[in-house]
Amino acid sequence: MPDSADTIYALSSGALPAGVAVIRISGAKAFIALRALTGRDLPLPRTASLCSIRNRNNEIIDQSLVIVFPAPNSFTGENCVEIHSHGSRAVMASIFAELDNLGGLRPADAGEFSRRAFENGKMDLLEVEGLADLLQAETEMQRRLAVEQSSGQLSALYDGWANRLTRARALIEAELDFADEEDVPDSVATQVWEAMAALKGEINAHLQGGGNGEIIRDGFKVALVGEPNAGKSTLLNALSGREVAIVTDIAGTTRDVLSVDINLDGYLVRIFDTAGIRETQDVVEREGVRRAVLTAETADLILILQDNDSTPKQSIGSFDNQRSLRVRTKTLLRSRASDDDFDLSISAKEGIGLDELRRALKREIEKRVGSGQTLVPARARHKKRLEETLNYVSDALDSETLDLAIRSEYLRLAATSLGRITGRVDVEDLLGVIFSEFCIGK
């Protein structure tokens, strides 16, 4: 693990070249480094000052805006410096060379600035994960989910629950220790378990949205399945707006699973084109069919495609009806099928029915995640810890015949599980994984 006593630096802005590049320095020697680079006293805290950045020969490297953030009022909680320079590779290389030459400074590892912010109490683990998701957000709903998490709204909810568990335990301890005292009202036990029953209901309702956050964050998975030449690859290309899949009249052209991401009104949708499902003696095609079925089974929604002039096989119609839509393709051709057999009719090649399909996809997404609801668990680990919390609270409520001390212990375990979501309880084994999601300089 990197030494948190080191002073670190990195490029914190985007790829070079750029109009402006931002170098961040954090640690005990950050201000010493800035004085060495500028040859002048520090500017006023949190005030942008124009300075000449110089090399060891006192030659000007660049004219830069410099901002200093004294500890603890900085992103990392340490002394921090930001240097806003022109974003050429030559300027950055020269400044980094001077920082290397100063001694006592080193380049930051991926996510190290954010890790220091966490270790210094500037962010909790939920906020760190939210920041990582915000940096990678590609759609409006991903941005909203990440902002609610990174701004502490989800942490506030979980901390509130933890405080209610702590208060319940305190009341139980009071009843255990001072049962004979008049200061402890007889109704304390009733209050505690009524409050815990209410908390159980809130956690349970929150968990109902447990998959919603993962769908928003990781994408709504849509599998295109059907017989060979049903129009799956043509539809994939039409929805993505580019030639992703090879389209021919030869049955079995698609052998492997292809995927493309699209932004559907703020939602990330992952569309999977699969091999045509049919009986075949071809070993490679048979493996493609196996993968097609597996992809469909793990998708959030299955689009079962059938062209106008074919009769669907039983194997195509055996998927979960609750997770599937039947789509008639190639609608400009003559048809043996009734429109009543399908949820949608399209011609991907001609662009017919695609807007209706997009609207149907959005309706399916919002049926799963709710319209605009983003205060939900965003990761599988959040859901796992919440389920643990719910189980412990349930155990405490259901153990009426057990000693109060045992029931109080269940509540302590529930609070511990909540604490592992925010990082209030030891989560050292998680930190390396989480901070590896960050780029250098964040």
UniProtKB/Swiss-Prot annotation:
Gene3D superfamilies: P-loop containing nucleotide triphosphate hydrolases (3.40.50.300), Probable tRNA modification gtpase trme, domain 1 (3.30.1360.120), tRNA modification GTPase MnmE domain 2 (1.20.120.430)
Top class in the EC scheme: hydrolase
Domain of life: Bacteria
A biological process term (GO) from this entry: tRNA wobble uridine modification
TrmE-type G domain span: 219-366
Cofactor: K(+)
Binding site for (6S)-5-formyl-5,6,7,8-tetrahydrofolate: R24, E82, K122, K442
Function per UniProt: Exhibits a very high intrinsic GTPase hydrolysis rate. Involved in the addition of a carboxymethylaminomethyl (cmnm) group at the wobble position (U34) of certain tRNAs, forming tRNA-cmnm(5)s(2)U34.
Self-association state and partner proteins as the record states: Homodimer. Heterotetramer of two MnmE and two MnmG subunits.
Protein name in UniProt: tRNA modification GTPase MnmE
Organism: Agrobacterium fabrum (strain C58 / ATCC 33970) (Agrobacterium tumefaciens (strain C58))
UniProt lineage: Bacteria, Pseudomonadati, Pseudomonadota, Alphaproteobacteria, Hyphomicrobiales
Name of the encoding gene: mnmE
